[in-house]
Swiss-Prot record:
InterPro entries on file: CRAL-TRIO_dom, CRAL-TRIO_dom_sf, CRAL/TRIO_N_dom_sf
Name of encoding gene: pinta
Function: Retinoid-binding protein which shows highest affinity for all-trans retinol. Can also bind all-trans forms of retinoic acid and retinal, but has lower affinity for cis form retinoids. Required in retinal pigment cells for rhodopsin biosynthesis.
Highest taxon listed in the record's lineage: Eukaryota
Record protein name field: Retinol-binding protein pinta
GO MF entries: phosphatidylinositol bisphosphate binding; retinal binding; retinoid binding; retinol binding
Deletion consequences: Visual response is impaired, characterized by abnormal electroretinogram (ERG) recordings which show loss of the prolonged depolarization afterpotential which normally occurs in response to blue light. Expression levels of the opsins Rh1 and Rh4 are severely decreased.
Gene3D superfamilies: Alpha-tocopherol transfer, CRAL-TRIO lipid binding domain, N-terminal domain of phosphatidylinositol transfer protein sec14p
Stored SUPFAM superfamilies: CRAL/TRIO domain (SSF52087), CRAL/TRIO N-terminal domain (SSF46938)
Keywords: Retinol-binding, Sensory transduction, Vision, Vitamin A
Pfam families from the UniProt entry: CRAL_TRIO
Signal peptide interval: none
Length: 273
């Protein structure tokens, strides 16, 4: 539960045009979660305000997002259970840097690089790759909700992709992956595949099947480079920011320092029948 503290009012006043109305909307969401304990969502001001902002301050839309998000976390146990940063399989993928937040683009949206071929498909399961990626994404939402609320720009770097990587992504897993994008409160505004091999569209067509028309319209493929304008682009993408290795070290440390955060987050999943 939360209260209408002065800090909450200050937080709302800095981002929203009608603070009192927004506070009332957050209270509505809080009361709704209490009345629907099976959803078992995080009932803090910060969390509810984030869902409200990313729903364009539509309370009913925010309720649907909350319900979908916490149901996904309950159903996808392979991604959201036992998220100990010290697990060997998680450590390996953190070191490799499979999911690297970069910073805001020119439109102040959060840019992330997803390195689709950083892992060895003979050693690392795709579910563990997704698990590690979502651990970092969840922490990113906590550390920089302001930028994330404006949307996510994902650069999917396919450098080094091999047949083994494609074979890991069966249609069932692709469907679940796409569904998870839309279940998160922060929506992808751009999905740009770069360093893509010639046959990539055959692979991406399976993704497109499960995408909504809106998400499908935001997917682009490049042979090299990126169209994203971001001062912090990594060197590997032609920018002046930290390298993939430096970003991997940074986010590995952040995840390890926030181990308690994952224990707390584990409490919030819908109660499945």
């Amino acid at each position: 539960m939360w209260s209408r503290s002065s800090s909450s009012k200050r937080q709302v006043a800095t981002t929203d045009g009608d603070p009192e109305r927004v506070l009332a909307q957050v209270q509505d969401l809080s009361d709704w979660l209490v009345a629907n304990p099976q959803i078992n969502g995080c009932n803090t001001f910060e969390n509810l305000h984030f869902f409200l902002r990313t729903s364009k301050f539509d309370v009913e839309r925010a309720k649907k997002k909350l319900k979908t998000f916490y149901q996904m976390r309950a159903e996808r146990t392979e991604w959201f259970d036992n998220r100990d940063p010290q697990l060997p399989e998680i450590q390996d993928l953190l070191k490799l840097g499979v999911f690297l937040p970069i910073g805001p683009d020119a439109e102040q949206r959060m840019v992330v690089v997803i390195r689709t071929a950083a892992h060895d498909p003979k050693l690392h399961s795709q579910n563990n790759v997704f698990k590690t990626s979502k651990m970092i994404l969840d922490l990113l939402l906590k550390l920089d909700p302001e930028t994330c609320a404006r949307g996510m720009v994902a650069i999917l770097d396919m450098q080094g992709v091999q047949l083994g990587h494609a074979l890991q992504m069966n249609p069932k897993l692709i469907k679940r992956s796409v569904e998870s994008w839309t279940a998160y409160p922060c929506q992808p505004k751009l999905l740009e595949f770069t360093n893509a091999p010639r046959h990539v569209n055959f692979f991406l067509n399976t993704f497109r099947i499960f995408m909504t028309p809106k998400i499908r319209s935001r997917l682009f493929v490049r042979r090299e480079g990126t169209s994203v304008s971001c001062d912090q682009l990594p060197k590997e993408l032609g920018g002046q920011g930290l390298s993939y290795m430096e970003l991997s070290v940074k986010w590995k440390q952040l995840v390890e320092e926030n181990a308690d955060f994952y224990v707390e987050q584990d409490k919030y999943k819908s109660k499945l029948k």
